[in-house]
């Protein structure tokens, strides 16, 4: 189980990313449309004045049940060992263990 503080920090980053998503996207569109370099620098300064944790690259995918940051399956939102336990307990519909 991950520390609660790390899970809350990640949730805070997700909220910030949602809050500044439209602003960040509009500034990036402006940068691509404007040909002059001086105007691009001004808009780039506005982009850098946004909070650091509002950038989508700062987000990290975590397991829903344990908060584990590694070995996550996107389809389920679970880490590998929790996914294995749930499949063995038949808690995930349609998921079967492979055997050959």
Swiss-Prot record:
Compartment(s): Plastid, Chloroplast
Keyword Heme among UniProt keywords: no
Domain of life: Eukaryota
SUPFAM superfamilies: Glucocorticoid receptor-like (DNA-binding domain) (SSF57716)
Similarity comment text for this entry: Belongs to the universal ribosomal protein uS14 family.
Cited NCBIfam families: PRK08881.1
Record-linked PANTHER family: 30S RIBOSOMAL PROTEIN S14, SMALL RIBOSOMAL SUBUNIT PROTEIN US14M
Name the record gives this protein: Small ribosomal subunit protein uS14c
